[in-house]
Amino acid sequence: MRDKIRNARRIVVKVGSALVTNNGAGLDKAAMGDWARQIATLRGAGKQVVLVSSGAIAAGMQRLGWQKRPHEMHKLQAAAAVGQMGLVKAYEDAFSRHNLHTAQILLTHDDLADRKRYLNARSTLTTLLELGVVPIINENDTIVTDEIKFGDNDTLGALVANLIEAHALVILTDQQGLYTADPRRDPNATLVCEGRAEDRSYEAMAGGAGTGISRGGMITKIRAAQRAARSGAHTCIASGNEVDALIRLTQAEPLGTLLYATSSPLQARKQWLADHLQLAGDLILDDGAVVALRSGRSLLPVGVVEVGGEFERGAAVACRSAGGDEIARGLVNYSSSECRRIARKSSTQIEKLLGYIDEPELVHRDNMVLR
């Protein structure tokens, strides 16, 4: 089973606040530098890595001299704004020592709930990975409240795994992994080495919330693993204090707890497309496009003869034959008005007709499911 992590080409690594800030003592730049070194090693092995890092609020608290986490929302958001500056600078310095560029991306749950913004974020992250850049993601704590209230960066890591169709999510924490009971209270507690992410019994084992610095606790990590599994990603929960933890995990060493998915990212995505999309419009295809889609290819503008309905980029549309039969459905890369302007045209003409080009396809095959 550990080969699932070794074979993962695209990995999301989530690092918790307690690790980043050395349990609230300030940014642990030595540890951050070591994770950068390990991620550089993974990049050298041909893997793409996205880093989801907590720590902005905790770093801000330390800079402001606050010993206890405040309850007032405006103070938490102020701490996040102060701490984010130092957090990103420390990572930039660490990765630059390995000749790696980094990119800061601050997300909110709304960015991933809105289909248009979801596709924009997906395109940006995919481009950064193709350029060899290491994206560093955090929740935009300064303007949102959900993450601050609930300590939700574990869930953010799972959502990012879904966004980029990652093969694995690695959650580094200050614990060894999931235990059958709280090892601080039960001497008979044992480490869960691996199991299906969908196994609901793990929630009972996970217990309650985290510390004053780390807000998540094991329960949010288990739920993040369940969410990641629904998009086909395997999750490993392991100690970030282990020497070379990331490197050893990608060498199939049995560290921490592996919670594996039962379907691949693409299979899971196709199932989601088939089950959950509400159609906003129709694309009527010529015979050549029908054959192309049934052969597993993407839908190009040249194959569309008519556009039905009004919709925005990222909406779900049905791809139909001239006779009205639904051939496929998927997420469209352009709005209905834009689709009408580029229908029956070559992809090379998109930029000339629209003034920009998002994608050469109207619907990419990975965002499409045949009927």
Swiss-Prot record:
Residues 280-357 form the PUA domain. One of its GO terms (molecular function) is ATP binding. This is Glutamate 5-kinase. ATP binds at K14, T173, D174. It is found in: Cytoplasm. Pathway: Amino-acid biosynthesis; L-proline biosynthesis; L-glutamate 5-semialdehyde from L-glutamate: step 1/2. Pfam families: AA_kinase, PUA. Substrate binds at S54, D141, N153. PROSITE patterns: GLUTAMATE_5_KINASE, PUA. It comes from Aromatoleum aromaticum (strain DSM 19018 / LMG 30748 / EbN1) (Azoarcus sp. (strain EbN1)). Belongs to the glutamate 5-kinase family. GO terms for biological process: L-proline biosynthetic process.
